[in-house]
Amino acid sequence: MKVLFGVCSWGLGHAVRDLPLLKRIIRRGYEVTVVGKGRSLDFIKKELGEKCIYCEIPDYLPPYSEKSFSVAKFVGRFPIYLREIAREHKKIKKLVESNGYQRIVSDSRFGIYYPGIPSYLIFHQLRFIAPGRVRIFERCTEGFNYLSLDNFNKILVPDLKQEDLCLSGDLSHNLHYFKESKVEYLGLLCDLKKMDMPEDIDYFISISGPEPQRTILEQKILPQLPLLKGKIVVALGKPEEEKEIFYHGARIYSYLDRKTQQEIMNRSRLIISRPGYTTLMELAILGKKALLIPTPGQTEQTYLASYHMRKGNFYSVSQEKLDLARDVVEAERYPGLKVNNIQPEDAEEKFMQVVFGG
């Protein structure tokens, strides 16, 4: 069977959560073509090498601004957003007609589908949530997603169905328009395993996200490293580079492969990172405490950070007000997410069952 798999390029998180699914598809013996761009595609290439075919097709800019959010800006960008989705779909249509795929899986790319071929969307943001919770805006965005996603056989949400245990909150729960038969809650996707080892790293700092905010966070954090006491490891989220340096006693990597990141996260007492959804799944599976720094302008991360701070799981601070020495003390007081007996392998198995029938 030939499978087309689209990966979103809005940071590395989508590529990271897709990795265990791609590995399962490959193990099944299917031929996989990965569509992506930039660092996300670079990451997949480094992890899977010649096991896949790769095709670079750019996706579209996210429908939010880089610095601040306003409903007017969001709505104003929608016509551009729709044109970009249509342009993406036109390229995908040519690719499908040239290669004859039997299944299509897309992570958060609305234009990667083909009529008549079973197409599935991995997506955890079925409604957009603006700061201040403008309810009519939220209903409109859910309605837009509902109509836009009708091209897919099912929406695969990488979250737990139980509202008291879920990670995404109102992003993908308490829905008004989506029918239960259309949405499949897979569980948590994470290729990292919890390991029994001493926590001999005090702080692991993961700097990530779309540019220019990734670089801005790097420039904000690195000068503050001397103010932290203990052993520090930093990952810069740049898979196109392979560098390792020491800076004010901290070990800094341009990029960590998944095996190394698994070990370092297991050894760390506190994780400092963006509240990207993939990161939250990793924190939950590993049972780690964290300091969360939302990417400015990304309403999803702002909501998730606020949601989990309100639930008493993690401490969060804005990028602008970040004071590492002060904020790590606050973050230590929060216990992290507890999802006992949740196995990522179950989510992978459910994905294979839904998409391939077993």
Residue positions per predicted region:
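Conserved nucleotide-sugar phosphate-binding/catalytic loop shared by glycosyltransferases and other
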Residues: 2-9, 27-79, 251
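A short, glycine/small-residue-rich beta-strand->loop->alpha-helix junction that serves as a flexible
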Residues: 7-19, 212-215
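Donor-nucleotide binding loops and adjacent catalytic segments primarily
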Residues: 22, 184-270
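Conserved nucleotide-sugar donor-binding subdomain of glycosyltransferases
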Residues: 69-111
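Leloir-type glycosyltransferase catalytic cores
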Residues: 77-80, 313-358
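Active-site proximal beta-strand in glycosyltransferases
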Residues: 115-131
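A nucleotide-sugar donor-handling region in carbohydrate enzymes
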Residues: 130-212, 236-239
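A donor-sugar binding/catalytic signature common to diverse glycosyltransferases
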Residues: 261-303
